[in-house]
Amino acid sequence: VYDVSTEQLGTFDLVFVGSLLLHLRDPVLALERLRAVCHDRLQVVDCVDPMLDRFGRWFSGARFQAGDGRMEWLVPNRRCLGQMVEAAGYVDVSVGRRFTIPFRATRGGVAHASVTARNPSALAD
């Protein structure tokens, strides 16, 4: 994902990123690189840590867990996930409500959130 280019893939009106960012060492860089192929809208659906939301809606943070044998680098809360998209240069960022996706390995499933945004270059068209 760090090496995507318009020469390889062209551009897309919608780029969907699903349960990917938590597995990347630099998720903001990945989102920045995806802007090259994102003509207009970005939709991110990824894991979030509901425990971090308990600190209040203005708290932005992530649980770093690399090195403990898991495949995830970090799991943000909803606010942090939205700020990662903003930091990657997208605009009109909107963070949706938290929801749970059933997963057999965990009781109760895995918390996720959805973020929608636009590539600022689409607004100039």
Residue ranges, per PLM feature:
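Short catalytic micro-motifs in class I SAM-dependent methyltransferases
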Residues: L14-L20
